[in-house]
A protein has these predicted regions:
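Short, cationic-aromatic polyanion-contact patches
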Residues: 7-17, 33, 66-88
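Short beta-strand "wing" residues that participate in macromolecule-binding interfaces
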Residues: 62-63
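Glycine-centered, phosphate/nucleic-acid-interacting loop/turn motifs that mediate DNA/RNA or nucleotide
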Residues: 59
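A short acidic, leucine-rich amphipathic alpha-helix
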Residues: 36-39
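Amphipathic alpha-helical dimerization/coiled-coil segments
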Residues: 80-108
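Short helix-capping/hinge SLiMs at alpha-helix to coil transitions
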Residues: 25-30
Length: 108
């Protein structure tokens, strides 16, 4: 079963980093282990490890707590770059929604 791509991924492309950002921006109220991030974003753990340290070093994500040996992470909403990403994420969603509404108006 193929899952439907988000509007964000339709516009920005399906690069693994975009998939991770899309997941973290969409589900921004909770923190996740690296394994959960990889699974929910649809990327392999080894691929996530190629770039996740850059996201952490640039404060795009932040470590929120430690559960056993696992660190938990979430998107860092205090970072101005992330705030701009959130705005972009919503703008893309709004744009796609308007496109769909126009299609429905034409069909009806």
């Amino acid at each position: 079963m193929e899952t439907e791509k988000s509007s964000y991924l339709e516009v920005m492309g399906e690069h693994p980093m975009n998939k991770v950002l899309d997941f973290l921006l969409t589900f921004d109220e909770f923190d996740y282990s690296l394994t959960e991030i990889a699974q929910n974003a649809g990327v392999s753990y080894s691929t996530l490890m190629l770039f996740f340290s850059k996201l952490e070093a640039n404060s795009i994500v932040k470590c929120t707590r430690k559960v056993g040996k696992s660190k938990m992470f979430m998107i860092n909403k205090e970072n101005p770059v992330v705030q701009d990403l959130i705005k972009l994420h919503w703008q893309i969603a709004k744009q796609e929604m308007h496109k769909e509404l126009k299609k429905e108006m034409v069909v009806v």
